[in-house]
Amino acid sequence: MIYGNGIDIQEIRKIQKAQEKRESFAKRILTVNELAIFEKYKGNRKYEFLAGRFSAKEAFSKAYGTGIGKKVGFQDIEILNDNQTGRPEIVKFPGDNKLQAKISISHSGEYVVTEVILEKLTWQTKMKKFLIKQK
């Protein structure tokens, strides 16, 4: 059952300017794990990554129904790529014991657009998540 849907679009250049103005910008947006990935990238790819994560966290907060603020901050949400497929996954977020998150991040030219769909977990999905963690 769908709990919420969030979509966000960002101009990569604006995120780049924010980072160039304040180096602490990325540290405010990205978790420690995300920051380690960000620091490995060079040139435009670095800013595409940062804009993608910023946009994804905004989209999540819209799907969750709170926006970014007191209830949900950028550090409360972590997005990493699956080691086998490279697909982005929201691995940490508020309500992760009751909700399942699906994410899509797309870069095109000067823009990044993201969509997050939150679904309420059924008991079957909860059991599947539990069994995967046990491996």
From Swiss-Prot:
GO CC annotation terms, alphabetical: cytoplasm
GO biological process terms on file: fatty acid biosynthetic process
UniProt catalytic activity: apo-[ACP] + CoA = holo-[ACP] + adenosine 3',5'-bisphosphate + H(+)
Keyword Metal-binding carried by entry: yes
GO molecular function: holo-[acyl-carrier-protein] synthase activity; magnesium ion binding
EC number: 2.7.8.7
Keywords: Cytoplasm, Fatty acid biosynthesis, Fatty acid metabolism, Lipid biosynthesis, Lipid metabolism, Magnesium, Metal-binding, Transferase
Principal location class: cytoplasm
Cofactor: Mg(2+)
SUPFAM superfamilies recorded: 4'-phosphopantetheinyl transferase
One Pfam family of this chain: ACPS
Cell compartments where the protein resides: Cytoplasm
Entry keyword Cytoplasm: yes
Binding site for Mg(2+): 8, 58
UniProt xrefs under InterPro entries: 4-PPantetheinyl_Trfase_dom (IPR008278), 4-PPantetheinyl_Trfase_dom_sf (IPR037143), ACPS (IPR002582), Ppantetheine-prot_Trfase_dom (IPR004568)
Role according to the record: Transfers the 4'-phosphopantetheine moiety from coenzyme A to a Ser of acyl-carrier-protein.
Family label: Belongs to the P-Pant transferase superfamily. AcpS family.
UniProt protein name: Holo-[acyl-carrier-protein] synthase
